[in-house]
């Protein structure tokens, strides 16, 4: 059966992409007049091009991630499972919600979600071998999407790895500040776009701190442009992994293992 969130397909420069009814996902129905005036935003998430129908674009603003706040109890009729962060529009008290796009894609395209979570569950069947040097230490990750948190936890569970997740980069950095040393941490995964502290801030602060500067950092993000990859690697990240690629995550863990935790014979 067709997913009611998917309106159909459009062709853009020879590429066919699905169009998602964003207001419907949020629980709103556009009137005929609104639909007539609506527009489609085309976006690229991890090399997946999608169209999102919206009633109107009020404007575009560039924000520093310190201006982005985690979701909280808004005391109003809003599905907080869809809202992961918020901010305020420039020079106003207008609240602007930031949506969990990964959750949107999973719900709008369940076949893609099934493949993603099936790949996480099948990790154990592939017989990957992880050294005790990595297994005995903990992987830390910063990720504001609940759906991706669940996915990453599933991958690490299947590999038999210890891990601890944080809802944003600032919470991760605050946790690192409480540690006397990094002996119990094998590596850090970080998203790029998060409230309070972005992945760029995580890399910058970890590299500036003598305690954490030698800890491996893997950027795990939907923002998979060449510019983003080049920028974070230049900042000192070890690897850049686009969401969602289970085999690449495992391969990257192995690369970290070989470089930082070589086994002696």
Question: Where in this protein do the model-derived segments appear?
Answer:
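Alpha4 helix (beta4-alpha4-beta5 surface) of REC/receiver domains from two-component response regulators
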Residues: 201, 223-242, 247
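Acidic catalytic/metal-coordinating carboxylates
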Residues: 168, 198-201
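Flexible, small-/acidic-enriched active-site or ligand-binding loops
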Residues: 1-6, 57-94
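Acidic, metal-coordinating helix/loop segments flanking the phosphotransfer/catalytic sites
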Residues: 165-187
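Receiver (REC) domain active-site loop signature in two-component systems and cognate sites
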Residues: 14, 194
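Short amphipathic alpha-helix used as the core "switch/output" element in two-component signaling
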Residues: 200-213
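Hydrophobic/aromatic residues positioned on beta-strands within the core alpha/beta folds
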Residues: 218-220
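Charged docking surfaces used in two-component/phosphorelay signaling
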Residues: 150-157, 170
